Amino acid sequence: MGISRDSAHKRRATGGKRKSLRKKRKFELGRPAANTKLGSGRVHKVRTRGGNTKLRALRLETGNFAWASEGVARKTRIADVVYNASNNELVRTKTLVKNSIVVIDATPFRQWYEAHYVLPLGRKRNPKHAQKEDENDVLTKKRSEKVMKKYLERQKYGKVEQALEDQFTSGRILACISSRPGQCGRSDGYILEGKELEFYLKKIKSKK
């Protein structure tokens, strides 16, 4: 039997059974779930009603994630699926769906932050390493007074909350997928911050 999105198979409001009046129709069809997994990208095109197409992602490993408080987005690698409100099975099988809580690589965001504010973010304090730092390092690079004035002005607004900074130190940050990988073929989302981050950290901790 094909997957159907009709209501002909449902019982009446009174609880009585309905008699089938016709066969299934093309416009009532449903398709199996994509169950997008973590892995090197594999996206299929699906022809839909009206000759339109959907992009069915079967495997994805990267996504475009937004850092809302800083107004910046970067493409980064998805490392793991850690929480899903609807189903624990989706966490165990590392399935990417909308609203999955995932762990992403923090490097692109750290690089942007350090270049934008000239402030260290998530760097382990190591004096030996500090001596060996080369001149190409964004933080130690020589700048004119005029340019430095601009950065000092920016630094007033460059505060990152403690919970997020701790994640940057580990090199992994929690994010939420807001796109639908099985429909648009992408796993884009946003970095968790504030109360939302607090909520999910508590949830993940209680599961362990």
UniProtKB/Swiss-Prot annotation:
Assembly notes: Component of the small ribosomal subunit. Identified in a IGF2BP1-dependent mRNP granule complex containing untranslated mRNAs. Part of the small subunit (SSU) processome, composed of more than 70 proteins and the RNA chaperone small nucleolar RNA (snoRNA) U3.
Question: What the protein does?
Answer: Component of the small ribosomal subunit. The ribosome is a large ribonucleoprotein complex responsible for the synthesis of proteins in the cell. Part of the small subunit (SSU) processome, first precursor of the small eukaryotic ribosomal subunit. During the assembly of the SSU processome in the nucleolus, many ribosome biogenesis factors, an RNA chaperone and ribosomal proteins associate with the nascent pre-rRNA and work in concert to generate RNA folding, modifications, rearrangements and cleavage as well as targeted degradation of pre-ribosomal RNA by the RNA exosome.
The family database entries (InterPro entries) matched by this protein are listed as: Ribosomal_eS8 (IPR001047), Ribosomal_eS8_CS (IPR018283), Ribosomal_protein_eS8_euk (IPR042563), Ribosomal_Se8/biogenesis_NSA2 (IPR022309)
* Zinc recorded as keyword: no
Report whether Metal-binding shows up as a keyword of the record.
no
Q: Where along the chain is composition biased (Basic residues)? A: 8-23
The family database entries (PROSITE patterns) matched by this protein are listed as:
RIBOSOMAL_S8E
This chain's protein is named: Small ribosomal subunit protein eS8
Annotated GO molecular function terms are:
structural constituent of ribosome
Tell me the membrane topology, using the record's own terms.
Answer: Lipid-anchor
- Primary location: cytoplasm
Q: List localization entries.
A: Cytoplasm; Membrane; Nucleus, Nucleolus
Taxonomy of origin reads: Eukaryota, Metazoa, Ecdysozoa, Arthropoda, Hexapoda
Superkingdom is Eukaryota
PANTHER family named in the record: 40S RIBOSOMAL PROTEIN S8 (PTHR10394)
What keywords would UniProt list here?
Answer: Cytoplasm, Lipoprotein, Membrane, Nucleus, Ribonucleoprotein, Ribosomal protein
Return the annotated region ranges for Disordered: 1-23
The record's family statement is: Belongs to the eukaryotic ribosomal protein eS8 family.
Which terms does the UniProt entry file under GO BP? cytoplasmic translation; larval lymph gland hemopoiesis; maturation of SSU-rRNA from tricistronic rRNA transcript (SSU-rRNA, 5.8S rRNA, LSU-rRNA); ribosomal small subunit biogenesis; translation
GO cellular component terms, alphabetically, are:
cytosolic ribosome; cytosolic small ribosomal subunit; membrane; nucleolus; small-subunit processome
